[in-house]
Amino acid sequence: HHSGFTDDRHYLWAATLDTSKIFIFDVHTNPNKPKLHKVITNFVKASGGIVGPHTTYALPGRMMISGLSNNQDFGGRTALVEYTNDGTYVATYHMPHDENLYGATKTGQIADGYGYDVRALPRRNVMITSSFTGWNNYMMNLGKLMGDSEAMKRFGNTVVVWDLHSRKPKKVFDVPGAPLEIRCAWGSQNNYCFTTTALTSQIWLIYEKDGEWNTESVATIGDPAKIPLPVDISITADDKHLWVNTWNDGMTRVFDISDPHNAKEVYTHKIGDQVNMLSQSWDGKRVYFTSSLLANWDKADGPEKMPQFFKAYHYKDGKLEQQFAIDFLKEKLGLPHQMRFGAYSLYAKSPKDGAKVAELSK
């Protein structure tokens, strides 16, 4: 499902939501020919029952993995799981919930113990997690899920701010409607992050003020009544704009976040029948999109006649211009979900002769 580089960019960790296996690829020895280095098959046992590893996030010498579920009831209560770069289990850090807050302060009405994404701001000694749903829900057919009123109650509604050094949760915030991807500002003085809620179509700001962390809804995405279903987001390198993809209507949107407390939509563009992840170049001139959300949730077909794709665009004068597209079903490539790009220039190492390395994108 998702993948992430280790801090030295030598290995790419790819996690699976159903089997809970984690595949570690050597992408350093020969970038032209990534090689399977190791498979972690005992994630559930080692972690104490965590199921559905999602985000594989690099910390110094470590990989922090966010779980989505557990092997007791396969619901949404879960944890963060830490490994060394070579794949050795370190520790499990449970998400705070009403029965055990693990020392955290509940700032609102909810402490559900759910998880999804994880990001960190080391300069502020902060780690942030969001919340989605458990194995029972994400493995269910989407139509069946939407028609099950009880299942629809089992989505996360919280964001948690952690102490990065101690790995202990500090504050639990009410962010209703399944907050998904977390993206943090790039500027060294910009101590804030964004997330979007899949079920309520809101952009939320997670920010520090006077040494305390807070959350605030700062914009509405499309028409929430039509369930556009915001998924991936990406902040431009100058911290002035936020890209937001909405899976259900296949749109991408750009919001002006020059004032992060007052986000304003400035551009929309139809990408396809559905759209999920995006990645943009550091200079902001290229944006890439993929289509698949989850195999059991994806649309079978639509007017665009290309339900599963990778599409590349130039972004110039505030508008997208498509350059090419790859039909993943036609090419029998499977379901395209996430992209990861790397650049030798960032790590001061020249590529080997003949190696073709993609430009760094975020």
PLM-predicted stretches and their roles:
Residues 20, 27-121:
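Asp-box/WD-like beta-propeller blade repeats and closely related beta-sheet repeat scaffolds
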Residues 1-8, 52-59, 112-125, 182-189, ...:
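Structural signature of eukaryotic scaffold interfaces centered on beta-propeller domains
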Residues 27-30, 84-88, 164-167, 208-211, ...:
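Short loop/turn segments that connect beta-strands within beta-propeller blades
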Residues 193, 201-203, 224-304, 308-310:
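Loop/turn-rich, solvent-exposed surfaces of beta-rich toroidal or solenoidal domains
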Residues 108-253:
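Beta-propeller domains
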Residues 37-49, 90-113, 169-180, 214-228, ...:
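Surface-exposed loop and turn segments in beta-propeller and other repeat-based domains
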Residues 18, 28, 69-71, 132-134, ...:
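Residue-level signature of beta-propeller blades and closely related beta-rich strand-turn architectures
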Residues 6-10, 66-78, 130-154, 290-310:
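Short, conserved, GDST-rich strand-edge loop motifs in beta-rich repeat architectures
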